Amino acid sequence: MSHKIYPIGIQNFEKIRNDGYFYIDKTALMYQMVKTGSYYFLSRPRRFGKSLLLSTLEAYFQGKKELFEGLAVEKLEKDWIKYPILHLDLNIEKYDTSESLDNILDKSLTAWEKLYGAEPSERSFSLRFAGIIERACKLAGQRVVILVDEYDKPMLQAIGNEELQKQFRNTLKPFYGALKTMDGCIKFAFLTGVTKFGKVSVFSDLNNLDDISMWNEYVEICGISEREIHNNLETELHEFAAARGITYDKLCEELRECYDGYHFTHNSIGMYNPFSLLNAFKRKDFGSYWFETGTPTYLVKLLQKHHYDLERMTHEETDAQVLNSIDSESTNPIPVIYQSGYLTIKGYDEEFGMYRLGFPNREVEEGFVRFLLPYYANVNKVESPFEIQKFVREVRSGDYSSFFRRLQSFFADTTYEVIRDQELHYENVLFIVFKLVGFYAKVEYHTSEGRIDLVLQTDKFIYIMEFKLNGTAEEALQQINDKHYALPFEMDERKLFKIGVNFSAETRNIEKWIVETKN
């Protein structure tokens, strides 16, 4: 039986190595990066191993050879020189006031000044930072290594607060600008974050920064690949399958469906979310481990603010320029959602340079769509999961009347804000409901110009539904018959329901449905 200790939530490389935690060797890629450049930026979703990568770099630049015993870099590195390191972690503060950023910068600068001395004439954060870099280089006789974890956390937390975001930007831009000013004293700089802010970037002065976020050669630098699972966790896969009472192949398929699917460039291999994957191995159970550690409230607010058509999210198309930049004034919520890890690259059109996006895996898709429901429908967060269970039971038992009455209750008490965009609201609610039902039954969903048609299949029943806005239920049913939507099921023995539904803008609800049955 395997006795691996999984480093869940542990981001300190030294602790992982000294205390015998499981570690997947990323040091060959790290070494390649160090030897082929000086300034790097990497964006990955939260809990994807960015902090551990920084901690690994820190141990390497401290010359702690003993920690790398048995790892690839042990044979690659000959010198193991110790460099002065300035490690700034912006992850530990909640940025709700301009002082919160000032406090954390001041705290770090003060700690470094105790090591390398202070100069009274250096009043601003950027001057103090530049002075520290210069003095550290002189004192140590080696150039300085700078590591910044979650450089963008203040900016992300201020999305929607234009004034605060501007203050943070005005503080961070000159601060990071010191990296360019002090280039001669810097050996290596690595900044990580979830996002890359565009035109108004705090990096606009740092044009020598290599953004490796979409470089194919560094796809595996964070996260876990299928190859790495089989090379490092083969015994554990068999134990996991036995504990679940399923075959090895079935387990691999379920792990892939739940946690794989992150693509950070076109034609790249899929990466597994390490946080969810290691939790699943530790507990020998499937859960929404990553999703539950952070709620995407600010993303949902962005979607609502920009009146976004949710159905588009499953096949959104965009180019690299949009994907890679977040402009605080932008009306497009997609880059933030992509960079936060709720969407990923699903395809690429080489001719036009367009990326097709979608949800990476079931954990994210189901978690995100479930999370949306209380924001769009008349249902609270506590009741929400039970409502979906009831929907599923009703369609499985052929009880379409209860199903539609429940759907009506979702549209009750629609706010005035939503009324302004009636059609989009009703499409969004139906998309969420049928997407969630689709995790338990087969659903094909199509929408165009104010009408929605869908086919929902269970073991015993087939439902063909046509939804109209401000038409009649009779017209909707007629459409099903005129377009021969039931034709593919002619020989099917399951009971078939054709249902025409009308949604009234006046009552802001489902006004009527009529059903035609075929046994």
Regions inferred by a protein language model and the residue ranges of each:
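Phosphate-binding site recognition
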Residues: M1-Q422, V437
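Mg2+/Mn2+-dependent nuclease catalytic core
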Residues: Q165-N170, L469-A486
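Metal-dependent nuclease catalytic cores in nucleic-acid-processing enzymes
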Residues: F175-M182, P335-L343, F431-K435, Q479-I499
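Conserved catalytic cores of phosphodiester-cleaving nucleases, focusing on short active-site segments
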Residues: L430, I452-L469, K483
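Domain-level recognition of nuclease-like catalytic cores that cleave nucleotide substrates
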Residues: P488, D492-N519
